[in-house]
Amino acid sequence: MTRIIVVTSGKGGVGKTTTSAAIAMGFAQKGHKTAVIDFDVGLRNLDLIMGCERRVVYDIVNVIFGEATLNQALIRDKHCEQLYILPASQTRDKDALSQEGVGQILEELAAKDFEYVVCDSPAGIEKGAHLAMYFADDAFVVTNPEVASVRDSDRMLGILSSKSRRAEQGLEPIKEYLLLTRYSPERVRIGEMLSVADVQDILSLHLLGVIPESKSVLTASNSGMPVILDEKSDAGQAYADIVARYLGEDIPHRFIEEKKGIFGKFFGSK
Amino acid sequence: MSLLDYFKITKANSTATIAKERLQILVAHERSFKNQPSYLPQLQKELLQVIQKYVNVEQDAISVNFEQDEHQETLEVNIVLPEKSR
């Protein structure tokens, strides 16, 4: 069975592509055959984050128009042989994607025994974003603890529950998970940032994990390595937790509380 | 700033608290529109066309509201007729 996951948010710049790259790599590292698809036609970036930008020959639009086969367009990841990347087109019009074309690609991936297909949604609520979520079984809603992002996530939840294939066909609804990114426990403590509990109060979503604000996200993207491969980094560990949790492991949440300083280590109560 | 001031800020007046209150109001408001049937704007337009065949009303003379609670859905159509011309 293939599980289709959309990574979505509505708002741009909250960490969709970072998350897509990290979790796809996480599934593949655990031995699951995984494909990650960039739906941002015209503004593709997943290839850069995955470090395969120089190996892109064909893209999703070529496959939909029959100009290349799916096998020709899929790029095998250089770190993990269970992971494949399907890039977006950089030159085509964003309306080049079609529901029928995307549906066929997903069916073909299922026939090739892919276990997970991660759909990296573009920002906004237009065609690319719509098609990225339309066929999904699960939605990872990436949210920053910030008013605009929370509002857009709520809007996205409405769209997931009304405009998806599962909604239209009256099937079991898409399972929605919250990924709170760029979290800073220090700023939450001094009242400068919405807390995990605040965001959950508003969105009423199941929390899959919190990714702390981390320098490692930028350094990972600099070198084209999904941040989950940086096993020493907090963000890398947070994504590894999320992957394991999604796959059913019972892992306590981390990165919600502040790291204990030297005094905390000596005098900490817990 | 005393220690007491510090605690005051983190509780009631912090910007995070303001953000949460603003979001709760906004999200509740926007969700109330979410469940509206998608045909409402078209319905409003067509109703207006029919009424205009008989009465000379303005574009904004008609309002269509959809409300929903646990037990029932209410579609309220309000048409303001012009005052009789003399």
Question: Where are the language model's segments positioned?
Answer:
Chain A
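Walker A/P-loop NTP-binding active-site region of P-loop NTPases
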Residues: I4-A68, Y116
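Flexible glycine-/small-residue-rich
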Residues: S9, D38, P87-Q90, S121, ...
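Residue-level signature of catalytic and energy-coupling elements of molecular machines
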Residues: G12, V63, L86, D120, ...
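Alpha-helical segments flanking ligand/cofactor-binding loops in enzyme cores
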Residues: M25, E107, H130-L131
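P-loop/Walker-type NTP enzyme "switch/lid" segment
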Residues: F39-A111, S221-N222
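Amphipathic alpha-helical transducer elements in NTP-driven molecular machines
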Residues: V57, N71, Q99, G103, ...
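Conserved catalytic-core segment of NTP-binding enzymes
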Residues: A111-K112, Y116, P122-L208
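C-terminal lobe/tail of nucleotide-utilizing enzymes
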Residues: A167-K270
